[in-house]
């Protein structure tokens, strides 16, 4: 997975209108989303329940954009094949979700998918050092996972900078998720993020504003990181 030529924006469907879900997917696709981010929650690893493989399958039918599936579930391994078969392009598991992170990442790759590892705000960067050779993406949670619309945790940027240094020379993308807006995107991009997950900041205001919101987040991040589309 080569580094992107610009900062990518991945709208999180957790903030979409579930009553018109397919329309929402197609609207953010048309508005310029680079990826579509799906937050899968089990009510156990995180204190919320969202959706499963059948919803991912429905989203796959509605868009050709890459599907970025973030598994906030424990255990994750029994469900990897189902999400891969449903159409995920990239599957991210949490470092905190089980004792056998190598096994989970190897299983994702064996399914022919890109593999990501996520870190909660309180988990140190060093937790992923042993598996860097197995990952295509590192996701730094910038809020505690479970709910949308939370406030960006600025202190996670130091962890992101450490991860970038730790992974120097590797072909790895760095994603941030939580509290991302046009105001917080510059800090994330300056610290090294090249994939920004945004939920409320994209979906509030209705479909007619999705394109403006995506462009504002991407533009603010690119100016901070020195990248220009």
Predicted features by range, described:
Residues 21, 28, 39, 83, ...:
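Conserved, mostly hydrophobic/aromatic
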Residues 108, 189, 203-229:
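C-terminal helical cap(s) of enzyme catalytic domains, especially alpha/beta-barrels
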Residues 44-76, 80, 185-201:
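A short alpha/beta connector and helix-capping loop motif
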Residues 12-16, 41-43, 72-76, 96-98, ...:
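Active-site beta-loop-alpha junctions enriched in small/polar residues
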Residues 10, 29, 35-37, 68, ...:
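Conserved beta-strand positions in the central sheet of alpha/beta enzyme cores
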Residues 35-53, 143-149, 202-204:
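Glycine-rich, proline-tolerant flexible connector loops at the mouths of alpha/beta enzymes
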Residues 17-20, 62, 66, 78-82, ...:
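Conserved anion-binding
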Residues 1-15, 22-23, 222-229:
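N-terminal amphipathic alpha-helix/helix-capping segment at the start of soluble metabolic enzymes
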């Amino acid at each position: 997975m080569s580094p992107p030529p610009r900062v990518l924006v991945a709208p999180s469907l957790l903030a979409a209108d579930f009553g018109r879900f397919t329309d929402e997917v197609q609207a953010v696709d048309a508005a310029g989303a680079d990826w579509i981010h799906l937050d899968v929650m089990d009510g156990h690893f995180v204190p919320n329940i969202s959706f499963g493989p059948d919803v991912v399958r429905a989203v796959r039918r509605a868009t050709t954009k890459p599907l970025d599936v973030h598994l906030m579930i424990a255990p994750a391994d029994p469900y990897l094949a189902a999400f891969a078969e449903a159409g995920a392009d990239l599957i991210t598991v949490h470092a905190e979700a089980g004792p056998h992170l190598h096994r989970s990442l190897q299983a994702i790759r064996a399914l022919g998918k890109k593999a990501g590892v996520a870190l909660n705000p309180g988990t140190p960067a060093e937790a992923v050092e042993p598996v860097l050779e197995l990952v295509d993406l590192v996701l730094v949670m910038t809020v505690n996972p479970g709910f949308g619309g939370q406030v960006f945790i600025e202190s996670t940027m130091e962890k992101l900078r450490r991860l970038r240094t730790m992974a120097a020379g590797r072909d790895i993308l760095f994603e941030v998720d939580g509290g991302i807006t046009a105001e917080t995107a510059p800090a994330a991009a300056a610290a090294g993020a090249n994939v920004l997950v945004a939920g409320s900041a994209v979906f509030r205001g209705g479909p007619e504003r999705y394109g403006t919101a995506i462009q504002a987040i991407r533009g603010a991040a690119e100016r901070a990181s020195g990248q220009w589309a």
